[in-house]
């Protein structure tokens, strides 16, 4: 009877947990639909800004923001995008694994999301700055504020390189940790077929220096929004798997309970029959 009582408790607990994971799956699905529209609009905006900025870069020869042969990368600031909440599968762990595999002793962390703060504090890694005010209503104004801080760190020479590590959204079941260099900017060797269509005043370099804030805030906004949609997709998938596993566990426990109960009833009947036979004998 003790075993039956224990199995019944396990079944009840599994059902309760299943209700929670199913509810979390529904919430994540709703957030995914909401932010999915935002990421589509954001990707279009980011694409346009990139196109314009790349044109400026092609016409620029010298700038502290451009990579050249003299650049010596000794100290990198890693901007790590994590979530504020857990229960989202390997979303945070995969990003942090990519960071650690490239991290040097002199490097520091700019932690975005409370999970990043706790992860690197636990590893005794120096956090230069942090931002935990990141939810699905993350705004371009917030991205600009972060961008201004990063620009200050790089312009002052405090860091030789700034890299963002975030989760790139591919589809609802596929997302991968991605490393993106922000500074110094690599000037791609391309044929300048559109040179005659652009004129920069007073110079391309001056335009670059003035436009770099827009470039940086756009990257920050785009990567965080893309990370957020990946987070919700990862959480929905994790909770769906947890719910399905819970149902399977509940099914197996129910079978075990019924077998134990049947064995108990059979034993009781056997004892009654044996007792009756003894009395009759």
From Swiss-Prot:
Sorted UniProt keywords: ATP synthesis, Cell membrane, CF(1), Hydrogen ion transport, Ion transport, Membrane, Transport
CDD domains, per the entry: F1-ATPase_gamma
Disulfide bonds: none
GO molecular function: ATP binding; proton-transporting ATP synthase activity, rotational mechanism
Record protein name field: ATP synthase gamma chain
GO cellular component terms given for this protein: plasma membrane; proton-transporting ATP synthase complex
UniProt xrefs under HAMAP family: ATP_synth_gamma_bact (MF_00815)
Subunit structure: F-type ATPases have 2 components, CF(1) - the catalytic core - and CF(0) - the membrane proton channel. CF(1) has five subunits: alpha(3), beta(3), gamma(1), delta(1), epsilon(1). CF(0) has three main subunits: a, b and c.
Organism of derivation: Mesoplasma florum (strain ATCC 33453 / NBRC 100688 / NCTC 11704 / L1)
Free-text function comment from the UniProt entry: Produces ATP from ADP in the presence of a proton gradient across the membrane. The gamma chain is believed to be important in regulating ATPase activity and the flow of protons through the CF(0) complex.
Protein family (similarity comment): Belongs to the ATPase gamma chain family.
Compartment(s): Cell membrane
PANTHER family in the record: ATP SYNTHASE GAMMA CHAIN (PTHR11693), ATP SYNTHASE SUBUNIT GAMMA, MITOCHONDRIAL (PTHR11693:SF22)
InterPro entries listed in its UniProt record: ATP_synth_F1_ATPase_gsu, ATP_synth_F1_gsu, ATP_synth_F1_gsu_CS
Domain of life: Bacteria
Main localization (coarse): membrane
Example GO BP: proton motive force-driven plasma membrane ATP synthesis
Pfam families xrefs: ATP-synt
Keyword S-adenosyl-L-methionine: no
Bilayer disposition of the protein: Peripheral membrane protein
